[in-house]
């Protein structure tokens, strides 16, 4: 079992999700701490005690790092009790278990998708109650879109906001996206009400946008790719970065200058 990102140097190469998570951590982007358990590692009471000591929580979010193809892929991102009875049955031969700090995706303040190209970054966002996966899978149109040049223009007097291009979903489009999100959540077994969503979309506050532009600058300088996406969220007033993708899927490794 490896505790990440602290033990990054011990991770075997070629683990797509883990590679991109560690790349973002290396660049100073905030990520959840996590633990990686191989498919052939026994999960025992001592394992659970070590995890409880590390996470200091009673629950974890479980994701899966596939190490071989599977005809029955398992959907990750769900929360489980950090107990032997809950975690041990999740282990299977096709995946490594990837346990992260718990997050309630229904309480996300924003889901953010960053599309990097050679000369610009397109920031797509959805609001409270939505998830960045809604954007990545094309299930929901963005509620707010911001385009910035690369490198980010700051201006002579730090008037960076003047150089951004903004667009927003209409109120009708926003309400329709709530209907679609509720349909998706119902199909996943969640029971939710419209109260988890804002009646109107609230644009990203300018101070958070300024922080995000700082991360964008850092990523654009150091990730050696021409066209890629970065997924992030804001939860409990904090940024969390998830992974990096290219248009043809996640790469095995990403070069860092």
PLM ranges: what are they?
Residues 1-257:
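Nucleotide/phosphate-binding sheet-loop regions of phosphoryl- and nucleotidyl-transfer enzymes
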């Amino acid at each position: 079992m490896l505790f990440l990102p602290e033990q990054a140097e011990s991770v075997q190469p070629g683990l797509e999700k883990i590679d991109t998570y560690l790349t973002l951590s290396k660049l100073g982007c905030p990520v959840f701490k996590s633990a990686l358990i191989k498919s052939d590692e026994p999960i025992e009471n001592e394992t659970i005690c070590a995890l409880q000591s590390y996470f200091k929580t009673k629950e974890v979010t479980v994701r899966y790092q596939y190490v071989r193809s599977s005809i029955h892929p398992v959907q990750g991102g769900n929360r489980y009790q950090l107990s032997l009875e809950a975690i041990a049955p999740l282990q299977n031969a096709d995946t490594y278990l990837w346990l992260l700090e718990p997050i309630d995706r229904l309480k996300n303040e924003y889901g953010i998708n960053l599309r990097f190209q050679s000369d610009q970054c397109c920031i797509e966002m959805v609001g409270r109650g939505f998830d960045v996966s809604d954007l990545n899978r094309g299930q929901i149109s963005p509620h707010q879109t911001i385009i910035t040049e690369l490198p980010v223009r700051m201006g002579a007097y730090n008037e960076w906001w003047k150089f951004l291009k903004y667009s927003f979903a209409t109120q009708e489009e926003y309400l329709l996206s709530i209907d679609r999100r509720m349909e998706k959540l119902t199909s996943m077994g969640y029971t939710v009400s419209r109260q988890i969503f804002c009646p109107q979309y609230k644009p990203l506050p300018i101070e958070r946008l300024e922080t995000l532009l700082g991360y964008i600058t850092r990523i654009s300088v150091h990730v050696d790719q021409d066209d890629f996406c970065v997924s992030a969220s804001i939860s409990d007033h904090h940024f969390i970065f998830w992974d990096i993708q290219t248009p043809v899927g996640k790469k095995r490794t990403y070069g860092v200058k």
